[in-house]
């Protein structure tokens, strides 16, 4: 799921962008 910070790497995830940070 792109733009989600709930991934394994959290906000460090490449798919997570600052503006989409949970």
Curated annotation (Swiss-Prot):
Please give the chief subcellular localization of this protein.
secreted
Q: Which UniProt keywords apply?
A: Amidation, Disulfide bond, Hydroxylation, Ion channel impairing toxin, Neurotoxin, Secreted, Toxin, Voltage-gated sodium channel impairing toxin
**An example molecular function term from Gene Ontology annotations:** sodium channel inhibitor activity
User: Where in the cell is the protein located?
Assistant: Secreted
Task: Tell me the superkingdom of the source.
Answer: Eukaryota
Task: Please tell me, according to the UniProt entry, what happens when changing residue 9 to A/Q.
Answer: Little decrease in toxicity at both rNav1.4/SCN4A and rNav1.2/SCN2A
Q: Where is this site: Important for activity?
A: 14
Q: List the disulfide bonds.
A: 4-16, 5-21, 11-22
Sorted alphabetically, the Gene Ontology cellular component annotations on this record are:
extracellular region
Tissue specificity annotation:
Expressed by the venom duct.
- Residues modified as 4-hydroxyproline are 8, 18
Among InterPro entries, the record links this protein to: Conotoxin_mu-typ
Result for mutant: residue 6 to A/Q: Little decrease in toxicity at both rNav1.4/SCN4A and rNav1.2/SCN2A
Which residues in this protein are found as Cysteine amide?
22
* Described function: Mu-conotoxins block voltage-gated sodium channels (Nav). This synthetic toxin reversibly and potently blocks rNav1.4/SCN4A (IC(50) is 9 nM) and rNav1.2/SCN2A (IC(50) is 40 nM). It also moderately blocks rNav1.1/SCN1A, rNav1.3/SCN3A, and rNav1.6/SCN8A. The block of SCN1A and SCN2A is modified when beta-subunits are coexpressed with alpha subunits.
What does the record say about domains?
Answer: The cysteine framework is III (CC-C-C-CC).
Task: Share any extra remarks.
Answer: Negative results: does not block Nav1.5/SCN5A, Nav1.7/SCN9A, and Nav1.8/SCN10A.
Its family? Belongs to the conotoxin M superfamily.
What name has this protein been given in UniProt?
Answer: Mu-conotoxin TIIIA
């Amino acid at each position: 799921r792109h733009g989600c910070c709930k991934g394994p790497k959290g906000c460090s995830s490449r798919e997570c962008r600052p503006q989409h940070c949970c």
